[in-house]
Design a protein with these regions (language model features):
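Short loop/turn segments that connect beta-strands within beta-propeller blades
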Residues: 30-34, 82-86, 124-129
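Conserved phosphate-binding/catalytic loop of the ribokinase/pfkB sugar-kinase fold
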Residues: 41
Length: 168
């Protein structure tokens, strides 16, 4: 029996199905056995605040947001990378409610919907070291950016389900 709170879902290039579950962390669905099991439940034997969305890089690394109940009052949401080697890395840990995330076309930048700050952040990615120069991509006039996508031309698409808007 599954008692989770699924938020996001992605299919890995090898066909495995991963779920970002607010309650249980990153889960793996086994269609053949009819099971769903935890893959990552938290950093250093702690539990996540409440994972929200996930995306795979071309090399197979998994990036995901840990939103929980964070916000401007508690800007401790995180973006994690789980490498193909099995290493969990916290890339950012000062985000007021990280939500959806997407790479640019070349995977040199990660865009993160920061729901409670009404913004989308741009995160330059560098495999050789820590993140630097994280910045504001767009400041919205209303609360709650959620899902993100990038089209073939590199345009970032931002959804706001509460208002029924999609921005390109």
């Amino acid at each position: 029996e599954y008692d989770g709170e699924p938020n996001g879902l992605k299919i890995h290039k090898d066909g495995r199905i991963f779920v970002a579950d607010h309650r249980h962390g990153i889960m793996l669905v086994d269609e053949k056995r009819g099971t769903i099991e935890p893959v990552i439940i938290g950093p250093s034997k702690q539990r996540f605040k409440g994972v929200n969305d996930l995306i795979f890089a071309a090399n197979g690394d998994l990036y995901f947001t840990d939103q929980g109940s964070t916000g401007l009052h508690d800007p401790t949401g995180c973006v994690y990378r789980y490498t193909v080697a099995g290493k969990l890395e916290c890339l950012l840990d000062t985000i007021p409610s990280p939500n959806g995330l997407v790479f640019n076309v070349r995977e040199t930048e990660l865009f993160v919907a920061v729901t409670r700050a009404n913004a989308v952040w741009r995160v330059p990615l560098d495999e050789s070291g820590p993140l630097t120069k994280v910045g504001l991509f767009i400041q919205l006039f209303c609360p709650g950016p959620d899902g993100l996508a990038v089209d073939a031309d590199g345009n970032v698409v931002v959804t706001h389900p509460g208002m029924g808007y999609v921005w390109l």
